[in-house]
């Protein structure tokens, strides 16, 4: 980040210019078999996402750079993660990290792995005890400066397909 103090002619926009998001766009069109595309969100487009919550619908013009923007698309925010990889959770209505007690759901599988020797070789066994809960860190449902990945799904498509806009064919994205 830009470490100059605000009084040295640096504005909030200069600080935000160094930050980028990775937008993972899930194509919900059944012809594309649910393909996902990674795009970047940076510069002034970044401010369009700050303060948005999981479930909000955003315009696709703010995703991508240059000719590879998703103009005409409507995208729904379905999740994301921060700079440490902590997942966002829709039930938390804040933007910061919180430690909460959870059962098996988003961000926690709810089982223990036990390694045992059986028949001369080591095997992994999953034990899923009833009522297993753990304390895990989650990021709230609001997009902040610490967010590094945003998961989006297509709600309303434009005339041109995502594969055509991004210059990839469906064979390349499936390999």
Can you describe what each PLM-predicted range is?
Residues 7-43, 53, 89-175:
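Low-complexity, rRNA-contacting terminal tracts
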Residues 61-71, 81-83:
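Short, charged beta-turn/beta-strand-edge "cap" motif at the junction between a beta-strand
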Residues 48, 76-77, 154:
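A structural signal for short, hydrophobic beta-strand segments that form beta-sheets
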């Amino acid at each position: 980040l830009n470490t100059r103090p605000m009084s040295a002619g640096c504005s909030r926009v200069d600080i935000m210019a160094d930050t980028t998001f990775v937008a993972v766009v899930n194509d919900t069109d059944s012809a594309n078999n649910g393909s996902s595309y990674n795009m970047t969100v940076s510069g002034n487009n970044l401010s369009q996402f700050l303060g948005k919550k999981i479930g909000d619908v955003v315009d696709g013009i703010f995703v991508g750079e240059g000719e590879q923007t998703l103009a005409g698309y409507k995208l729904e925010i379905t999740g994301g993660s921060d700079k440490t990889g902590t997942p966002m959770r829709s039930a938390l209505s804040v933007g910061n990290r919180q430690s909460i007690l959870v059962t098996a759901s988003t961000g926690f599988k709810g089982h223990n792995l036990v390694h045992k020797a059986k028949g001369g070789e080591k095997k992994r066994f999953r034990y899923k005890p009833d009522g297993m809960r753990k304390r895990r860190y989650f990021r709230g449902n609001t997009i902040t400066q610490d967010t590094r990945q945003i998961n989006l799904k297509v709600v309303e498509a434009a005339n041109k397909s995502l594969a055509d806009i991004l210059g990839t064919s469906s064979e390349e994205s499936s390999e």
